[in-house]
Amino acid sequence: MVVGDLHGHMGAAEWLAARALDEPGTHVVALGDYADRGDRQLETLVILLTLMLELPGSFTLLRGNHETRSMASRYGLEDAVLSVHDRAVMDAVHVVFAQLPIAAHRADGVLCLHGGIPSGARTLEELSAVPKGEEEPLDGTAIEVLWNDAEERAGGHGPNWSRGVGRTFGLDASREFMERNGLWLLVRAHQPSAEGFVRLHGGRVVSVFSHPGYLGGATDGAVAIVGMDRTVEPMRIFLGDREAVAGSEPPL
């Protein structure tokens, strides 16, 4: 099970926790962006960190573009933490964020990451070599993995005008990287969609977003179920009334 952006949606995190605990044979990979923007940011983060500790080896948290000090300060997590805890707790959260991996590779050819294929890395080994420990990633490959957007077009990498950081990647970029590294599927997050699940690049790239009603919109949240038989299907997150999310800024 692969989980996209949650952005402080505690209901979706509780939904995920129930399934992770009830189905111990399922390996869960969460793709980052756990807080910021939602109204239950701290609670959502606590649920996810608890699952990571309670289910070692079967619940993996990756780093997204919001797991940095600057994003936490701008989009609300820092305020949420400091409203009930002191600065030392926020500093500890950033230590955890800085140690999260930026990608996860399943041996049968599945790659999971938050944003997208980087322009400066050609192999999985290069992704594995990206240094951890930086509160604000400075490595160009790390920045692109966290920030790149998928576009349904031919071609390779292009400028990311909408975000002003990272790049976009098209079919040629994903196909070249995936064929070189023996991958049949890339699962990534980062971009909201109406149904929370989008197939791109001939079905070899799946984009998943797990916050229902993001920014107050009439959108679903979903996770991706990736089978060992190379099936990939969405599972909708049904919670009844969607939680409203404060703010109207363009998604970052």
What are these regions (language model features)?
Residues 1-252:
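Feature recognizes metal-dependent phosphohydrolase scaffolds
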